[in-house]
């Protein structure tokens, strides 16, 4: 179920979603404590915090993606961990909406699975990786932060999240895994090896560097061009 956020959902709506989910055996995607207004309205109208309200309606769990969680307090973070709920961090969206900085580093240290996303603010995951790396260093005033956590979010945790919701092995090149691959046109100015490739991705690559995209074994983009649709026709219609 794709839901917006606690502050736009009535108890009746949450109850209907909860009951329907039982029949469909599915999870939820919902924005959680993105801005202070979400928490403030929940406390004012329901006398509990956002994560507590979602737990009350059995919205949280292994199949649920809680987006943002910027203003979730310590108790709410404990609930997220206990229920196995996944969190997705969207740094550029948070900056653009001026809602604060995600406690993603803390959530990861706590044992919560945190993925990296965009919330529609961009479609360039290389860019999201760069911003995530910088924003936590700045916010926590620690230049050593995020070197490991951000690649973990993008390359390990996003894969885990995909495997929770879709059948198959994702985000890794091995026999039996889903054949999703991108080829990047990148000529490194300094040596690139197994110990520094994350830095090359972070500082040298960008979305427009993608030359080829293969999805489930099918080539959809080659030489930077979409193969299966007419871009000019779609642009003219739109």
What are these model-predicted stretches?
Residues 38, 75, 124-126, 135, ...:
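Active-site-proximal flexible loops/turns
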Residues 72, 93, 135, 187, ...:
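Short, solvent-exposed coil/turn elements at secondary-structure transition points
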Residues 1-123, 142-145:
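Active-site core of metal-dependent hydrolases
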Residues 56-63, 105-188, 205:
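His/Asp/Glu-enriched, well-ordered alpha-helical/loop segment
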